[in-house]
Design a protein with these regions (language model features):
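Short coil-to-helix "N-cap" segments within the ABC nucleotide-binding domain's helical subdomain
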Residues: 3, 108-125, 132-139
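Short beta-strand immediately N-terminal to the Walker A/P-loop
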Residues: 35-36, 85
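The feature captures the beta-strand-to-loop junction immediately N-terminal to the Walker
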Residues: 38-40
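Short coil-to-helix segment of the ABC ATPase nucleotide-binding domain corresponding to the Q-loop/switch region
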Residues: 95-103, 134
Length: 150
């Protein structure tokens, strides 16, 4: 095996419930290498990171870290081995709907210089995915969608 290989992800698949979010994804990172994973909101970047961390079980595939198969190891073990990531920052109420999360700070203001409904439509025009998911709980959104909501 390559002595410089830090992490190897082989054909990983994971998701939530019956929904597969990450499907047959593979990559390798060598010591000192920087890897950027990009994609649109809801494409599985956060799910992939949570799978590598062991916060979500891999349905298929293998995760190797420093020549050790860690696919079935606990999140605690992975953390102690040196695997970690900084999650996306977001402050939302996970039990409120998207629309309730948007409207809450508007309705808590004493004086408004605008129509709450107009402000809501303005926000939806900037973030169409939020309008599409306006009745969904905040916790059901992807990490990127939660960040937009915040």
């Amino acid at each position: 095996m390559n002595k410089n290989l830090l992490i190897k992800i082989e054909n990983i698949s994971s998701g939530y419930g019956s929904t597969v979010i990450v499907n047959n994804f593979s990559f390798e990172v060598e010591q000192g290498q920087i890897l950027t994973i990009t994609g649109s909101n809801g494409m599985g970047k956060t799910t992939l990171m949570k799978t590598i961390m062991g916060l979500i079980d891999a349905r298929e595939g293998k995760i190797t870290f420093k020549d050790e198969d860690i696919t079935n190891s606990s999140p605690d073990y992975r953390s102690k081995s040196g695997i970690g990531y900084v999650p996306q920052g977001r402050e939302i109420f996970s039990t409120l709907t998207v629309e309730q999360n948007i409207m809450l700070p508007i309705y808590t203001r004493k004086k408004l210089s605008f129509s709450p409904e107009d402000k809501l439509e303005e926000i939806y025009s900037l973030f169409p995915i939020l309008k599409e998911k306006r009745f969904a709980d905040g916790s059901s959104l992807s990490g990127g969608q939660q960040q937009q909501l915040a």
